[in-house]
A protein has these predicted regions:
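Short, surface-exposed patches at the edges or C-terminal ends of soluble domains, predominantly
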Residues: 2-531
Length: 531
């Protein structure tokens, strides 16, 4: 009998055909599912920190504040397969893709800047920032046709241990959401740094500028002796001045302080940063005194506060600020976002001086809310000043290398119960009656440490960065605070599987099921043949 017409051969042929069909079907289904999973972001985030998942806080913030009427273009400066092969870049990619999956007005593109450098040329010109293959650019066009963009380096998306420089967390969600909100605003509010007072253009100013930039400000510098503040200015920053501000007199027509007064009258905000080495500047300090801010001095020497029990350094001068717990106070309201965390972050004040009672202000205890504050009222002007951070009760004041005695502290007004311990940061609010039953406000925030904004202090290990964004949100009329938590790694090692190992696992997981089916088919065919 011809073997081709035998019953065994027919059964074997059917089994083999069925096996081949099943294998082909498995491969086809796998290819289709892979394509759909990539398009629709079907994946399970198995990291303990949910690195690849957008938090509910980020989704809620975007839902409330993101302008969906503007087209946003996110540019990765490398091809997608290269991004997927890098653990760090893959985190950034998945964050952006998950956001883009929620909003149709976000387009994501991949550009090889080495073969197509012109694709990012305009961004380089606009931002004056270096752009490389690891850069991520978020861009949109405002109502005036002007480009608004934010350029992120890969390093800026991660948090590092300040002592070991090891990666400890992923902060891309905060960076990207902030950028999306910033570039889609109809008009960016301006933050101006004052110049021409001996300010040293050091790294601390650069880091503070970056915080304001990320928060949504167009950051500029201004010489108030020669220029007026732009109409869109919402914040003026006075940072570590070494010479005085000019006030109008018979020999001088320039009046910087009059410009600041008018600016604050228009319901805007000022930040001032001083320290233990800030010289006596009579004009500026008269202005600050009017706003409840007075630098504490002993015999014309600024105090330097040593808080050994709450210091990050053995010298005792890198002080951890104590949160204000007085209910109902503006200082407590400003830090509520930090204190509401399960483990509130430390806010650090390196090399800090202190503030004392300002002339003309009266200390008040709001018995209903238990909040201590200072109040001022004269000629229709009403201001209240609140501490935001203080030292511990054990802190010491040093002047000229010597610890001050109690009698010396009393002589400079540092025994008032409302300001003990020493004040590191204060916020003053001026109240404006709009005449229609509503109120509006002007603000001045003063910090007694210029190192408050140094790189290590703004690391997401501490709360300095978030505190500044909360302050911008409270004081700025046109600024949305973005203070999403960093995702800290359970291990400081970002990934322990290489790209080649991942490829091997993929091949194994794809081939093993298909091979098993093939082998089973062969076994069945042989058994039936010899049955």
């Amino acid at each position: 009998m011809n073997i081709l017409h035998s019953k065994k051969f027919k059964h074997g042929s059917i089994s083999l055909a069925l096996t081949v069909t099943i294998i082909a079907a498995v491969i086809l289904v796998n290819a289709i599912f892979t394509a759909l999973a990539e398009k629709n972001l079907w994946y399970i985030d198995m990291t303990s920190e949910d690195i690849y998942s957008l938090t509910d806080a980020a989704k809620d913030l975007l839902a409330e504040e993101f302008n969906t009427n503007k087209e946003v273009l996110v540019t990765f400066c490398a091809e997608k397969d290269i991004l997927e092969a890098s653990a760090e870049q893959r985190m950034a990619l998945h964050t952006i893709l998950e956001i883009a999956n929620l909003y149709d007005n976000i387009t994501v593109r991949y550009v090889d800047i080495y073969t197509n450098p012109s694709a990012v040329h305009d961004y380089k010109i606009h931002t004056t920032q270096a752009i490389n293959s690891q850069s991520i650019i978020v861009a949109a066009t405002n109502k005036n046709g002007k480009m608004e963009c934010r350029v992120h380096s890969l390093k800026s998306l991660f948090s590092f241990d300040s002592s070991t420089s090891e990666v400890i967390g992923y902060n891309g969600e905060q960076r990207f959401v902030s950028s999306l909100l910033a570039v889609t605003q109809d008009e960016l509010p301006i933050a101006c740094f004052t110049t021409n007072h001996g300010e040293i253009d050091n790294e601390n100013i650069s880091y503070l500028s970056n915080v304001l930039y990320e928060t949504g400000y167009d950051v500029q510098q201004i010489d108030l002796t020669k220029e007026d503040l732009p109409a869109a200015t919402r914040l003026v920053v006075i940072y570590d001045p070494q010479s005085d501000f000019k006030a109008s007199n018979a020999l001088n027509e320039a009046d910087e302080l009059a410009k600041l007064d008018a600016f604050l009258d228009a319901r805007n905000a000022v930040m001032a940063f001083v320290d233990d080495e800030t010289p006596y500047l009579p004009n500026l300090e008269d202005f600050l005194n009017e706003w409840g801010i007075k630098i504490a001095r002993h015999e014309d020497i600024n105090l330097l506060i040593r808080d050994s029990d709450y210091s990050l350094s053995t010298s005792g001068y890198t002080n951890v600020g104590q949160y204000i717990t007085d209910e109902g106070g503006l200082g407590q309201s400003l830090t509520a976002g930090l204190t509401s965390m399960k483990y509130p972050k430390s806010v650090v004040f390196p090399k800090t001086t202190a503030f004392t009672a300002a002339d003309g202000y009266e200390s008040v205890n709001d018995e209903e809310n238990s909040a201590w504050f200072y109040t001022y009222y004269s000629n229709g002007v009403s201001r209240n000043t609140y501490d935001v951070f203080r030292s511990s009760a054990q802190a010491e004041a040093i002047a000229g290398g010597q610890k001050l005695r109690t009698s010396e502290l009393e002589a400079i007004g540092l025994q008032d119960p409302s300001i003990l311990p020493f004040s590191y940061m204060r916020i003053t609010r001026e109240n404006h009656d709009n005449g229609d039953g509503t109120m509006s406000y002007s603000y001045l925030l003063a910090c007694a440490s210029t190192d408050f904004t140094r790189s290590a202090a703004l690391n997401s290990t501490y709360g300095n960065h978030q505190l500044l964004t909360y302050a911008c949100s409270m004081m700025g009329r046109d600024v949305v605070s973005v203070s999403l938590s960093c995702k800290y790694f359970a291990s400081t090692e970002i990934a322990n599987i290489t790209a080649s190992e991942a490829s091997q696992y993929t091949v194994v997981l794809t081939a093993v099921p298909a091979s098993a089916i093939f082998i089973v088919g062969i076994v069945i065919m042989i058994r039936r043949r010899y049955a």
